[in-house]
Amino acid sequence: MGHSPVATALVALSLAVLAPCALAAPGFSDTLIGYRYSDHYTDPGKTKDVAKNILQITHVSSYRLGQNFINLDVFKSDRNDPAKGGGTGATEFYLTYRNQLQYGKFFDKPLAFGPVKDVALTAGLDYNTKNNEFASEKRLLVLGPTLKFALPAGFLDASVLYAREWNHCGLDVCSKPGNHTDLLFDPFFQFNLTWGVPFTAG
């Protein structure tokens, strides 16, 4: 199964830019562009530390019925994590998208009880591709309820998500009889906590 990291990056960046524009309404909106570097990353099957340059683009926004979260990480490895065929380090793209459809915004009255101020339905996907020998192509879909807790300031969300993952193995061993290059994993549940609480240091 071939893939083009450049094409994938364009698709991912298009999602990151266009989805919020299509869904956003008056409310909050924030975008972060960041950069990270370390020469002490470890990858499965690698005996040496891997140096990686990482570009991050994150966007969060509200819209009439809920809110969006989009994150794209672009990883560029050194030669200790080579691209297929060698000569340069591998490049990986990892896109995460989550959308919340809030009960209170849909019905104009929150579903509140105890410490919970509202309930939402969360849906989303993870999309990954990497141009090394393994050639992973992760496709993850998630769906499930989210409890939105009332806090004096900030937010706290707890989600239970039903998840299903598809992936790809480009190694020669995966093409041998009895093995598979395209993989479908058993369904599983994700338990996610997301929070942001302001505080003052010093």
Language-model segments: residues:
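Surface-exposed loop and membrane-interface regions of Gram-negative outer-membrane beta-barrel proteins
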Residues: 71-130
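Short loop/turn motifs that connect adjacent beta-strands in outer-membrane beta-barrel proteins
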Residues: 23-29, 60, 65-70, 103-120, ...
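Short glycine/proline- and aromatic-enriched beta-strand/turn motifs that initiate or cap beta-hairpins
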Residues: 24-75
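Hydrophobic, lipid-facing positions within transmembrane beta-strands of outer-membrane proteins
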Residues: 31, 53-57, 93-97, 139-145, ...
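Transmembrane beta-strands of outer-membrane beta-barrel pores
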Residues: 37-41, 74-78, 125-131, 162-168
